[in-house]
Amino acid sequence: MEREQDTPWTQSTEHTNIQKEENGQQTQKLERPNSTQSMDHYLKIMNQVDMHKQTAFWKQWLSLKNPTQESLKTRVLKRWKLFNKQGWTS
């Protein structure tokens, strides 16, 4: 059976299991995580990405100087539309 090509995703989720044989030699066995571990890893990464997006949004919000109510409304609507669009496509 052919081994799939390594990608950053598979490299980051692979684990090497080193075992000592009876004669003292060490053997390495590459273990791929099961689907539950892979999904947990994926969800953890995506949660970190989402938190980063939210943090960046609020930093921009707090950096506004003397905004008017209308400029805030316009800015919030633009950012909200952009955020939702990116959230569904990525």
Swiss-Prot record:
InterPro entries: Flu_proapoptotic_PB1-F2. Pfam families: PB1-F2. The record marks 66 as: Low pathogenicity. One of its GO terms (biological process) is symbiont-mediated suppression of host cytoplasmic pattern recognition receptor signaling pathway via inhibition of MAVS activity. GO terms for cellular component: host cell cytosol; host cell mitochondrial inner membrane; host cell nucleus; membrane. It is found in: Host mitochondrion inner membrane; Host nucleus; Host cytoplasm, Host cytosol. Residues 1-39 are annotated as: Disordered. Belongs to the influenza viruses PB1-F2 family. Oligomer. Interacts with human SLC25A6/ANT3 and VDAC1. Interacts with host MAVS. This is Protein PB1-F2. It comes from Influenza A virus (strain A/Chicken/Pennsylvania/1370/1983 H5N2). The gene is PB1.
